[in-house]
Amino acid sequence: MGQFTLTPSEQEIQAFLKQYKKYLSSSKNPYIRYFFRLEQATASVYTSGKLLLQGEEADKYALFFKETADLTRPPQKITYQAMIGTDEVGNGSYFGGLAVVASFVTKEQEDFLRKLGVGDSKTLTDQKIRQLAPILKEKITHQALLLSPKKYNQVIASGYNAVSVKVALHNQAIYLLLEKGIKPDQIVIDAFTSSTNYQRYVKQERNQVSQAIHLEEKAEGKYLAVAVSSIIARDLFLENLEILSQELGYQLPSGAGAKSDQVASQILKAYGMAGLETSAKLHFKNTQKAKQLLER
């Protein structure tokens, strides 16, 4: 379980309150000013001004306070002739696997990518992504990894958490791409945790990348190498979701909302836990919600 103790400014506290107001809860502790029950984490703002973040996704919320969370900051201006950029898709979805892609893009390829309409996958429709991905897979040197739901659950059960499993996949994708003989000037990861946590977790991996790695927020909108990875990863995730849907006979939704709870309860009724073990990330709260729906 991750834990961070920060000292944010009042302005940062109010900004956090505004963004996560729906998660605001009550606390019997008289020294807690605000208490948030977040997705897979809690946040306690004390009257002293301290902020305590705890839980599997504490890293994600610590990124909100990047000035006090000791996150890695890249140089003021990253200049490069060739870059590796990585991104992942599926970590916020109950159903489907976790896709991580590392892509190698040179300066000479940037005009081609811009004319193609490459951008952050979050701003593109699924239809556009399915059109772009085959072209990018053919033209851009990359390494794609997909951790199936079944394997994901096994890895989590073995001791990994939602953050360390992503560290392992990003590291492996970069390592395998470098093994192809390419020589990037820079390596950038779309930040999903702090640099401290990344380095702590990556030390546990067998294959480690020796070249410096920069973790940067919203990198998919800044670097084409990351944008390419974002698109290919999204395509890989959608393809996996389609295959799983066909195998189970249910249309599996992306995300982790009420729709996922409903479909999960239907799968539970039809196949039992075995159906979810091969199609969903079991440690998400959706699993318990699906069981509750089934009991009604």
From Swiss-Prot:
Keywords: Cytoplasm, Endonuclease, Hydrolase, Magnesium, Metal-binding, Nuclease
InterPro entries: RNase_HII/HIII (IPR001352), RNase_HII/HIII_dom (IPR024567), RNase_HIII (IPR004641), RNase_HIII_N (IPR024568), RNaseH-like_sf (IPR012337), RNaseH_sf (IPR036397), TBP_dom_sf (IPR012295)
Localization per record: Cytoplasm
Record note on cofactor: Manganese or magnesium. Binds 1 divalent metal ion per monomer in the absence of substrate. May bind a second metal ion after substrate binding.
Main location: cytoplasm
Function: Endonuclease that specifically degrades the RNA of RNA-DNA hybrids.
UniProt similarity note: Belongs to the RNase HII family. RnhC subfamily.
Matching NCBIfam families: rnhC
Protein name (record): Ribonuclease HIII
Organism name: Streptococcus gordonii (strain Challis / ATCC 35105 / BCRC 15272 / CH1 / DL1 / V288)
